Amino acid sequence: MLKIIEKLIGSYSEREIKKILPIVDKIESLAPEYERLTDAELRQKTDIFKERLKNGETLDDILPEAFAAVREAAWRTLKMRHFRVQLIGGIVLHQGRIAEMKTGEGKTLVATLPAYLNALEGKGVHIVTVNDYLAKRDAEWMGPIYNFLGLSVGVIVHGLTSEERRKAYNCDVTYGTNNEFGFDYLRDNMAIYKEELVQRELNYAIIDEVDSILIDEARTPLIISGPAEKSTDLYKRADNFVRRLKPLYYNSDDDKQMPDTTGYDYIVNEKRHTVALTEEGIKKAEKYFGVTNLADPENATLHHHIIQALKAHALMKRDRDYVVKDGQVIIVDEFTGRLMYGRRFSEGLHQAIEAKEGVRIERESRTLATITFQNYFRLYKKLAGMTGTAKTEEQEFREIYKLDVIEIPTHKPMIRIDHPDKVYKTEKAKFEAIVEEIVETHKKGQPVLVGTVSIEKSEMLSEMLKKRGIKHEVLNAKHHEKEAMIIAKAGQKGAVTIATNMAGRGTDIVLGEGVAELGGLKVIGTERHESRRIDNQLRGRAGRQGDPGESRFYVSLEDDLMRLFGSERIKRLVESLGLPDDQPIEHKLLSDAIEKAQKRVEARNFEIRKHLLQFDDVLNKQREIIYSQRRKVLEGENLRDSILNMIDELVDYKIKVYTGESPHPDDWDIKGLLQDLKFIFLDGELSEQDARNMTKDELKEKLISIAKEKYLKKEQEVGELMRELERVVLLRVVDMHWMDHIDAVDQLREGISLRAIGQKDPIVEFRFEAFEMFDQMIKRIQEDTIKIILHANVENMPKRERVVKEMYENSPSDAPVRKSVVKTQKVGRNDPCPCGSGKKYKKCCGAV
């Protein structure tokens, strides 16, 4: 029904493009006028546009002229002129949307249009790429356009100094990777001096390969961490223990029909990527480690280590999920097959794999600052993205990032032939058929690009081709420069290139001489990915800019996708046909089944990401509060009134804790109150007896008076340095407590799923307890700040310095040291919400 309506009124993208076309016509109509301008006159347009913006015109008002200026500048500097479809793409990006443009349609050039226009406001534009090589390449390649028009261009790559970074961020347009932009944001929010800040306000970002960054890497946390003091011995013991256990593999989604676990020690569900000890496994663990009850909270760390060891053995496969190289465990990116140097699996899984592989176990690390890409990129005032494949994830872009996806038509018609899948019963038969196909195609001289899902599979296929004497290149994407070079040659006559799925993304495959007559590039997929988008990316390597090309996927019933998500009906159908292993099966039912399996996995992964975002949003809200307050302190806000206000709030809170609701002094814990305040500011100024003879209000007034008197005395002692002392202390205290809070919230998140057993919504419970913990953290910050300021030794006045001098980055990092979460005083339903919104708790974060 939907398709019939679309035929009548056009798709959403077609309708939106129709609205844009008059603007495109206007840009094109300006071409003759701009061609007549001298270089100086064209350059002067930038100053004119800036002046018009100052006088009240909007970016939309000057868009046609600004785009016309960029178009002409591109021709004069690079001999490249934006096509009509590229102008459409540029407008879509300026509107804060995602432009889906096929491979080879010139996305890099398209970005110069909205980047120039938005840079005219003087607030900076970030163009985000997936690796350092592309960031440098694009900045150097497109730089002359911006420079010609009088704008500066910077590039942020790994290894730059703070000064170099600051200079790059102060440019009008800054190219860089998602990792570098994110880490700089975190580092800025750990800075102790204002002069250490490198980033400006996050204004406008254009993300290249937006699906890779906002979908595939959405759950990847950027973590700045420092080493934690923790023994690695338990990882070895847990590893020795799980080697003795017997697994039961069970891949059903039905929780009600659990299998008989008699004789098995743990269950592995590859589909859900989970492991769990059985009753027998729990008994063995209790005996092996000498504990009476593994489920006891005091054994939570032990249980966590056992589960990570089970995951390392049952779910994590060498040469698929990771490789062991030079005595180190290195992660393999599941989407690109790249080795991810410097990254580590989180929550102790990396150490568990190190124990399994018998290499040196690195110490766990402590999280100092963290943010996910999802939350980092949502900080920008305006966000846009480009990719060849976004339509399948349109719902996710809209729901999570409020980003529309607009399909941009190709400059020339697409003539690539996409053949139906060939399905085999066994993996062995499938790979033999692939080798035959490569051999036959190679005889004609037609280039072949073979996409594999893992390093292990690409090396296996390489061995098979060597035996047949076929010269080929294997691309496991260890070096981006080499990768781009190999991929660029993949379109030459007779070339055979094996590459893990999306290696070389961002580099065009240009057809060599005479290749178009042979049918163009042939793309062979050795397995269907669980995401249709990744398959489409591989297909998109052929048939760029109207070139000929063809693609085909080879599938076996032993592939992970079919094994875990294919239906039993399909397996029965294949068995009933009784065909030999080496005969391919072609049936519409099979093609439909593969697509249904992919859609099922995509929907499941989206739900997981959405669910995790609900948890992450809680910490994100708190992070925004802490970082914004921290920035005010850093930028020199006078803290005197804030400190005096802290004294009022602290005394009020302490009196509530030690006197409760009772109006009778006999029910109050005066001794406890005075003892507690002794560590903060009291020094015998108030006796227990005198305190007992006061009302609550009198007691509060007296204590506040004593504290403020101490504060004023310290102010006189220190003189001008008091403001600096306040800043030093507050920044130190906030950073230390924020680190502890990240740890505590992480641990709460791990244990909260158990609440579902008690018929409670884990999200609601998590939200409530996390804000309760946040409220307690704020109180601890107030207490420690007052205590340290009032007891500061003025002679040894501290200089502002980093809370942790040596930091190292892991993305994603290992889990921090866990601290047990202490249950704290509850927030009342009618109390102000601890998130700082000003609303009552029941109307804000406590709303169910």
Swiss-Prot record:
For the keyword Metal-binding, the answer is: yes
* Residues bound to Zn(2+): 833, 835, 844-845
User: What binding details are noted for the cofactor?
Assistant: May bind 1 zinc ion per subunit.
Note the CDD domains from the entry.
DEXDc_SecA, SF2_C_secA
Name the major location.
membrane
Question: EC number(s) of the enzyme?
Answer: 7.4.2.8
Give the membrane topology, semicolon-separated if more than one: Peripheral membrane protein
Q: Name one GO biological process term.
A: protein transport by the Sec complex
List S-S links within the chain. none
An example GO CC term for this entry is: cytosol
Query: Could you tell me which SMART domains the record lists for this protein?
Result: SecA_DEAD, SecA_PP_bind
Subcellular location, record wording: Cell membrane; Cytoplasm
**Reactions accelerated catalytically:** ATP + H2O + cellular proteinSide 1 = ADP + phosphate + cellular proteinSide 2
A GO MF label: metal ion binding
Please list the residues that bind ATP.
86, 104-108, 508
Entry similarity comment: Belongs to the SecA family.
The protein depicted here goes by the name Protein translocase subunit SecA
